[in-house]
C-alpha cells in the first residue's frame, strides 16, 4: 500500500506518480509511427552529426518522460496562444482549410508543419499575411530571446523559421486572389515560468 505521507520520503508518492506518467508517455511514443523524413524544425541544429543521424532515421537514445512532458506542455501552451491571439483580433489559421491539417511542405527528405498563418489582424504596422510560430520558454530562454533576438538566442528556432519562410508554398491571403509567398514571421514566445 502506498502511504500518502511517508515521513522517511515526503516526495515518495509524487515520485511514484511521475514515474508512472513517464512510463506511459514513453510507451505511447514507442507506439507512434516513425517519421520517414527530417523535420524542418531541427534544421537549425548546429550539430551536423545529430542532423545526419536524424536524416538516416536513427533515434535519439531514449527520450525520457520529463522531456515528453515538456513537449506536451508546449503543445498545450500553443493552444492557449491560438485562443489569445484570436481573442485579440488576429485571424490565425492553424489548419489548412483544404486538408484540415497543419500547413506543410515537403522538399526531398525534409518536411515542415507550421504552427499557423495569420491572415490579417489589428493595424500594428505589419503587413499580413504572416507565418506564425509559437514556443514556450523557461525564464532563462525568455530573457535570452528578449536580450539577443531570435537568431542569436536560439539557432534551432531561427533555422526553423527561415526554412518555413523559404519552403512553404505560396498561399492566397485573406481576400486575395493571387498566391503570395510569406516573407515575415510573427514568432510568439510564452514565458512558462511567469
What do these predicted regions represent?
Residues 1-131, 138-140:
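Metal-dependent nuclease catalytic cores that hydrolyze phosphodiester bonds in DNA/RNA
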Residues 98-194:
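Nucleic-acid nuclease catalytic cores
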Amino acid at each position: 500500500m502506498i502511504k500518502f505521507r511517508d515521513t522517511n520520503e515526503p516526495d515518495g508518492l509524487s515520485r511514484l506518480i511521475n514515474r508512472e506518467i513517464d512510463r506511459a508517455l514513453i510507451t505511447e511514443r514507442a507506439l507512434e509511427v516513425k517519421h520517414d523524413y527530417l523535420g524542418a524544425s531541427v534544421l537549425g541544429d548546429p550539430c551536423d552529426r545529430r542532423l545526419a543521424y536524424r536524416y538516416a532515421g536513427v533515434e535519439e537514445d531514449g527520450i525520457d518522460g520529463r522531456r515528453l512532458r515538456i513537449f506536451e506542455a508546449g503543445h498545450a501552451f500553443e493552444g492557449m496562444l491560438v485562443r489569445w491571439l484570436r481573442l485579440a483580433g488576429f485571424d490565425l489559421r492553424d489548419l489548412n482549410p483544404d486538408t484540415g491539417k497543419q500547413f506543410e511542405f515537403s522538399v526531398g527528405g525534409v518536411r515542415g508543419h507550421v504552427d499557423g498563418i495569420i491572415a490579417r489582424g489589428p493595424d500594428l504596422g505589419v503587413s499580413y499575411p504572416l507565418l506564425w510560430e509559437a514556443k514556450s520558454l523557461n525564464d532563462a530562454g525568455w530573457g535570452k530571446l528578449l536580450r539577443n533576438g531570435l537568431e542569436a538566442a536560439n539557432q534551432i528556432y531561427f533555422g526553423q523559421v527561415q526554412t518555413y519562410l523559404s519552403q512553404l508554398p505560396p498561399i492566397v491571403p485573406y481576400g486575395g486572389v493571387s498566391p503570395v509567398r510569406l516573407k515575415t514571421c510573427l514568432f510568439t514566445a510564452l514565458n512558462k515560468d511567469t
